[in-house]
Swiss-Prot record:
Belongs to the TRAFAC class TrmE-Era-EngA-EngB-Septin-like GTPase superfamily. EngA (Der) GTPase family. The lineage of its organism: Bacteria, Thermotogati, Thermotogota, Thermotogae, Thermotogales. GTP 1 binds at residues 8-15, 55-59, 118-121. This is GTPase Der. One of its GO terms (molecular function) is GTP binding. It holds the Pfam family KH_dom-like. InterPro entries: G_ENGA (IPR031166), GTP-bd (IPR006073), GTPase_Der (IPR016484), KH_dom-like (IPR032859), KH_dom-like_a/b (IPR015946), P-loop_NTPase (IPR027417), Small_GTP-bd (IPR005225). The gene is der.
Length: 439
């Protein structure tokens, strides 16, 4: 794990900064010099990125007692081994000989340094009186913050992540992935959902164990295929014939679809190939996408389509046009009655789930972003600085921009396409985007 060290002379607010960045009070904060005797460390997680943060004792220029000398020795050794150092100075009162002495050591050590000016609540005075003298330390532009009042800490975190990733360090938080894939087979009435479910079980020679439902949860089936566990949700709804009056069937089936989709990881969207794609099919597919679920699209009853051998391209085009919002989904042609193509469904589910739980390195994302932006005209006044993946299930990306109001649907389409074409295809999975204003 990457290690970031907070260093500085006593009483510049290192421990307060540490506590704010780790979001808990772990380092003792007092107004007396030398309160922090031993290094304190904790893990910082920020938008899916993780690193170790260490708060060191204040470095005295000329320590007088044995303990202070030992503290300084420990801190200087830790600096040599750190991946990045946050050099904290007093942005209210300016720098001293102690700061200059520590700056000299940091430059000679060759460690990467971010200069942090703390206590800059009076921003105007800082810019006018203090900031110019900080350039003497030799670390470029300082980042002004107020740890006590949590001012500008996001900017500092962005810089930390950027610096660490430039060094090629792995900051990704390892995702926790559930043991079994939860699958919902969804579609409008009479498209062959039940037949398809049973065909999967028969074709895959699956071992099935009903999981009893409660008053709130429908019955599920735990299915083992090639030693791998899958949970098909609401299989009771797939097995029993409807006892509901015809005029309420659509309303009831829509309710069941919503419930099943919410509980699933992957939705298998079943279409009737003899009827094409209807408005209700589009609504169901749209619901899957909005709920952030992975998906596989199945044209069932393919055996009943005339001249089917010559019509794969026609139906693929129909799928791309009418279900364009889930066109990342694997498309399969089946006949549940005859068992055609059924064996491909589990493979497609595995592919979609793998995409759904994939996390890509920020270095790959930002490398692609910079290359594509070099020949892309963004709306006037919009700048995209960098991005990172902050979640899975579904894959969610956060982009830092100068103006979030400039982000419209075309920019979202552009970024999703960039991710799929240049970073990772995420076949079968939606991609969610978030935006945050940054300077």
């Amino acid at each position: 794990m990457a290690t970031v060290l907070i260093v500085g002379k006593p009483n510049v607010g290192k421990s307060t900064l540490f506590n704010k960045l780790v979001r808990k009070r772990k380092a003792i904060v007092e107004d007396e010099e030398g309160v922090t005797r031993d290094p304190v460390q904790d893990t910082v997680e920020w938008y899916g990125k993780t690193f170790r943060l260490v708060d060191t004792c204040g470095v005295f220029d000329n320590p007088q007692d044995v303990i202070s000398k030992k503290m300084k020795e420990v801190t200087l050794n830790m600096i040599r081994e750190a991946d990045l150092v946050l050099f904290v100075v007093d942005g209210k009162n300016g720098i001293t000989k102690e700061d200059e002495s520590l700056a000299d050591f940091l430059r000679k050590s060759g460690v990467d340094v971010i200069l942090v000016a703390n206590k800059t609540e009076n921003q105007r005075r800082f810019e006018r009186e203090i900031k110019p003298e900080l350039y003497r330390l030799g670390f470029g532009d300082p980042i002004p913050v107020s740890a006590e009042h949590s001012i500008n800490l996001d900017t500092l975190m962005e810089k930390i992540i950027q610096k660490l990733e430039e060094k090629g360090l792995d900051l990704e938080t390892k995702p926790e992935i559930t043991e079994a894939i939860k699958i919902a087979i969804v579609g409008r009435p009479n498209v062959g959902k039940s037949t398809l479910f049973n065909a999967i079980l028969n074709k895959e020679r699956a071992l099935v164990s009903p999981i009893p439902g409660t008053t709130r949860d429908p019955v599920d089936d735990e299915v083992f295929i090639d030693g791998k566990k899958y949970i098909f949700v609401d299989t009771a709804g797939l097995r029993r014939k409807s006892r509901i009056e015809p005029k309420t069937v659509e309303r009831y089936s829509t309710y069941r679809v919503v419930e099943s989709i919410e509980r699933a990881d992957v939705a298998v969207i079943v279409l009737d190939a003899t009827q094409g794609i209807t408005r209700q099919d589009q609504r169901i597919a749209g619901l899957v996408e909005r709920k952030g679920k992975a998906s596989v699209v199945v044209f069932n009853k393919w055996d009943l389509v005339e001249h089917r051998e010559k019509r794969y391209d026609e139906f693929t085009k129909l799928f791309r046009e009418k279900l364009y919002f889930v066109d990342y989904s694997p498309l399969i042609f089946t006949s549940a009655d005859k068992g055609w193509g059924v064996e491909k469904i589990i493979d497609a589910i595995n592919l979609a789930y793998s995409s759904y739980t994939t996390k890509v390195p920020s270095s790959a994302l930002n490398s692609a972003l910079q290359k594509v932006l070099a020949f892309t005209n963004l709306p006037r006044g919009l700048k995209i600085f960098f991005g990172l993946q902050v979640d899975i299930k579904p894959p969610t990306f956060l982009f830092f921009v100068n103006n979030t109001e400039k982000i419209k649907e075309p920019q979202k389409v552009f970024l999703r396409r960039l991710i799929r074409e240049y970073v990772f295809p995420f076949e079968g999975s939606p991609i969610f985007l978030k935006f945050k204003k940054s300077r």
